[in-house]
Design a protein with these regions (language model features):
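Membrane-embedded alpha-helical bundles of multi-pass transporters/translocases
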Residues: 1-199
Length: 199
């Protein structure tokens, strides 16, 4: 149950962030070339995190990795919220690296936790249920994405977003709150739930 709750919260935060990202770079940063670079750096960082996960786990322990990863995403969200108005692409990318490093480690840790749940289920019940468990994970991801899509539509309406027009300062600020601050709060909750209840 803890894994399911953690995955739902994590996916919701990611969907809010990624759903607004292109709007943010189009109207907030006003640089789609930087958007492509930012996404590419993020992808490379997440792959690097997956590769480094086993080594980091050996040093700090798997449970601590997840908590540290949540902290990295929160720092990344906070950093992007602060520096996005400074016009400094390097600082923005550095904050993005912190965020994506956390995301990569969380993805790796979640896969390990699910595998452990399968093994534990086999130990306790005498049967492996990986197909059910991994299907449930896929369903959760799709459900979270769909639900966040509704929230994004509502959020755009709430901040008075006007397509293909210059956005007001309040609209840009609202966009940053939805894609950075709300996901940061969700990741704090995710870290607390995991740290307190995952054994």
């Amino acid at each position: 149950i803890v894994i399911i709750v953690s995955v739902i919260i994590f996916q919701a935060s990611q969907a809010l962030y990624s759903g607004f990202l292109v709007y943010f770079f189009t109207y907030g940063i006003k640089d789609l070339n930087l958007y492509a670079t930012f996404v590419a750096i993020g992808t490379v960082t997440q792959v690097a995190a997956l590769i480094l996960f086993p080594r980091i786990s050996k040093v700090v322990g798997r449970k601590n990795v997840y908590t540290i990863a949540c902290i990295l995403t929160v720092l990344g969200f906070g950093g992007m919220f602060i520096v996005s108005g400074m016009g400094n692409s390097i600082l923005l990318c550095l904050a993005g690296i912190a965020y994506n490093l956390g995301v990569g480690l969380i993805n790796a840790a979640t896969t390990v936790m699910i595998s452990n749940a399968v093994d534990y289920g086999e130990y306790k019940l005498g049967k492996r249920s990986e197909s059910i468990i991994f299907s449930a994970q896929t369903f959760i991801v799709k459900f979270s994405t769909a639900f966040s899509g509704l929230i994004i539509g509502f959020g755009l309406s709430l901040i008075k977003y006007v397509p293909n027009a210059t956005q007001t300062a309040s609209t840009i600020f609202g966009m940053k709150v939805i894609m950075f601050l709300i996901p940061a709060v969700l990741m704090v909750i995710c870290a607390v739930v995991y740290s307190k209840y995952y054994k």
